Amino acid sequence: MTKQLKLSALFVALLASGTAVAGEASVQGYTVSGQSNEIVRNNYGECWKNAYFDKASQGRVECGDAVAAPEPEPEPEPAPAPVVVVEQAPQYVDETISLSAKTLFGFDKDSLRAEAQDNLKVLAQRLGQTNIQSVRVEGHTDFMGSDKYNQALSERRAYVVANNLVSNGVPVSRISAVGLGESQAQMTQVCEAEVAKLGAKVSKAKKREALIACIEPDRRVDVKIRSIVTRQVVPAHNHHQH
């Protein structure tokens, strides 16, 4: 083959090769290896771009010519299930506060002592709370004296205490008073037995004094309180939800 023909053949081969590379490069914007089909890099690890490269449309992240798309935001965790609070039906709570007649009144008297006024004022503050449903004031006496006398004395004492509580702010609509006389005296037999042990040498006056002291718990005013309590309860299965 002549020298001219050899040159012509080489030119055609180069031209064909160049066309192929150019055609492939024009699609990707980078010089691509015909063997591995991967972007050719120089000694510095940089991607080789060709004349057809357009950064806006062809830039690649691995070549530093594009910014990676942000990762999608993680799905928010589902909100915890609301805690259901069940309000129970109102319940009644009954309580009795026993006030010694000795601290409230003089013996056989129905007028309040000075120190009793202060104690009843404190009690009235509690009885004025909104959850108090009702207040029943019960007057009691010991067995000494006639039934009729004791009944009247117990009523007077109950009314005196109830009126004092009302004057200190307890709503009159929730308070009542009743006298029960000696009907609920509990110390009679015990105290009579104790006094009998004193023997014949002890005078009647001393025995009477001892008996009066012994049956002192029967001389009392009971304040019976009924309160309404409403409790809020979280069902057990709510504690296991996450």
Curated annotation (Swiss-Prot):
Residues 92-229 form the OmpA-like domain. CDD domains: OmpA_C-like. Its main location: membrane. Keywords: Cell outer membrane, Disulfide bond, Ion transport, Membrane, Porin, Repeat, Signal, Transmembrane, Transmembrane beta strand, Transport. One of its GO terms (molecular function) is porin activity. It is a multi-pass membrane protein. One of its GO terms (cellular component) is cell outer membrane. GO terms for biological process: monoatomic ion transport. InterPro entries: Bact_OuterMem_StrucFunc, OMP_bac, OmpA-like, OMPA-like_CS, OmpA-like_sf. Transmembrane segments: none annotated. It is found in: Cell outer membrane. The keyword Hydrolase does not apply. Residues 1-22 form the signal peptide. Residues 69-82 are annotated as: 7 X 2 AA tandem repeats of X-P. Sequence repeats lie at residues 69-70, 71-72, 73-74, 75-76, 77-78, 79-80, 81-82. Disulfide bonds join 191-214. SUPFAM superfamilies: OmpA-like (SSF103088). Belongs to the outer membrane OOP (TC 1.B.6) superfamily. This is Outer membrane protein class 4. The lineage of its organism: Bacteria, Pseudomonadati, Pseudomonadota, Betaproteobacteria, Neisseriales.
